[in-house]
Amino acid sequence: MTHELSSTPQIDLLNDILKNSVESNVFSDYQKKQIVTLILKSKISTAIVLLSPKSTAASEWNYLCNLQDLHECVLCVDTILPANLQTIAKRIFSLVLLPPLNDWCKQLRDAFLRFVSQPSICPTDFPLKLFFLSTVGIELLIVNEKIIPQKTQKYLLYELFSSPSSITANEIARLCQEANNRNYLLQSLTSATDARRAFLNNPNYRLLSAIIFQDGPSNLAFVLAKDCVLLARQPETIPVSFERMSSLLLMCLPSHPDFISPEFCHEWTELAERNGLQEEWLNILNTACNFKECRAIIHKECSEFIKDNHTSRVAILISMKLAFQYQLSQVIPTLKLLLQSKVYDSVLLEALRQSSTLGPVKQLIADDSCLLNNLSKLLLDTNISPLDASSIATIIYNMCKFKITKSEHERELNQLRNMAEASKTIDYKEDETAPTERRIQKILEYDILSKLFSAAKHYNSLNGLLAMILVHMANYKLARRKLVQIGALKFLTRQCFIQTQDSNAAFALAKILISVAPHSIFTKAFPSNRAIHPMSKLLSTNSADTEYPILLGKFEVLLALTNLASHDEESRQAIVQECWRELDELIIETNPLIQRATTELINNLSLSPYCLIKFIGDKDSDFENTRLHIVLALSDTEDTPTRLAACGILVQITSVDEGCKKILSLQNDFNYIVRMLTDQDEGIQHRGLVCICNIVYSKDQEIFNKFIKTPKAVETLRTYITKQAALKELQHEALVMIDSRLQGSK
């Protein structure tokens, strides 16, 4: 049997709404009319007058202003709306009724601001409450806070956070993406007790707190934690106090560790036992156990409670954390209690994150194929929480971390830092190089790292930790090719690392690129300059805030750039443009390995005209003269690899007439070139012969004449003896050219 409804403008309007709704095709005509009836019973007709604000009666607006939440217009305070009809009703509100409300608020925006700026205003006056629950009103309240009197602000904030509407929460979240708006809310909530209590009780607290506290802990967290203590003394708000306390302590305990006191522990243990909130109290204690000062209090005051709840996984986790400080030998047995249940949840991940700093635990994880397989599976879950993803990344970092050999200066700094922190370190055999390399191999076998790369696309907080992981993994030479295959290079060249100039990401890049053929990696779609730019920044850094020693890092960057410089002209050009200022300084570095690596890099770069111009540019430039002086000096240094590289640079410089003339402008002869023939190293002799061929084949007669006049130049060339056929051929070519030109000049 169908029920006919009299046609009215409101009914026609609602029918039109249903007709245009995307969900409407699933309802029969009767169901649509039933929806209309229920909505009318909920006095939705009063809300529809928003479509024509000029005809709104004061009594209707007063009714709307007294609604606790705008959603009550469609959720039927008088009649319970059936669950199968709630979706369409909410859609009617959010898509059809809310926009007219916002339009109405926009029209009267200036009038409202003038009205609300009066010091004598009563915040409950019609129709302020409704206005400030609209998206436009929320924006005006937060963005124009200086216009609104403080008393009114506090009231409106209370009303704002008292609203259970997700629309209200989402609008606050949107506005709080701006730092100024977040600061306003932080300051306002800190001084507004009622608004804070409403904030704590808001059903959208998790969303709102994540947005408001996104810049890190603030004094507000400490104030809210104290509010929770007071709220817990009221029976109706005990559950919400326990629910909120754990996350608040995480933010306020670093600066207020004394919040966990014997009195607090006694009071909340009693509350938990009386109200059946033991698990919630254990979660709070677990958070507090992350702080050394708090562990002492908890160990003394709550040990009995923890023992009484020993079947709880959180209680086992707390026991493990306390064992770290009071009975280290019990850490692994306690961890095994969690592992034996084969439950791979957040509790286990936190336990592994905490304990995997210990060598035996690292090996325990590596030997448990079931555990590694489940860690890999957890990362496939698109709904994995940021904390769980971070825990897995931390576990992997601990497992693949090598013991780093730092420079003497860096060791002294670390020693002083450790003394200041009174930290204790234990050397485990599992931390030696061979076991660490085997663990890295296991991690790669289970494909955990590539899944972490995918997770990092959703959680930016993983990026820094993954860069640190890759620094250590790339230290294992046999893993480098596999790292390239799973996308490590593309991950390390993400824009986020370039913007933050992440040193660890650049170090990892360098380590991988030292021993991988560039042509097998870089393409037009993925050019080498993507890697060159971040590595170039490391050459000038002196920051100690890295996973690796600075000097070693710079050395490896130079080696990686040397490899890239052999790739193509575009790479050489990019390196010259990005790194030359640093190379000018590093080539005179007192550390012989750094100087050698720099010279070898410039040798490869000298194939490019962009590099050569740095030596043979302007005639009277001090910069070019100084660089050439340094290279000439290095061609006679004691370190053979450095000599070889410097002589290689001279080969390229002498390949052009301007380069030969530049040498003559500094030395007036080619003595440095001739001297290469007397070196004991055949590689240097080879370079010397090529230089001589470049000179004697020059069409510039002045260059040729200067060589002939160089003391003992021709004599040294004629008397040069070698068993190498290639060198004999070069010697012969040079002598033939000399004799030919001398004969022609007669």
UniProtKB/Swiss-Prot annotation:
Which InterPro entries does the UniProt record give?
ARM-like, ARM-type_fold
- Name its species: Schizosaccharomyces pombe (strain 972 / ATCC 24843) (Fission yeast)
What the protein does? Essential for actinomyosin ring assembly during cytokinesis. Has a role, in conjunction with F-actin, in assembling myosin II-containing proteins, such as myo2, at the division site.
A GO biological-process term? actin-myosin filament sliding
Q: Which Gene3D superfamilies match?
A: Leucine-rich Repeat Variant
Q: What is this protein called?
A: Ring assembly protein 3
One MF term in the entry's GO annotations: ribosome binding
Give the location in the cell.
Cytoplasm
Identify the main location. Answer: cytoplasm
Asked if the record carries the keyword Manganese, the reply is no
Keyword tags: Cell cycle, Cell division, Cytoplasm
**Keyword Plastid part of the UniProt annotation:** no
Species classification: Eukaryota, Fungi, Dikarya, Ascomycota, Taphrinomycotina
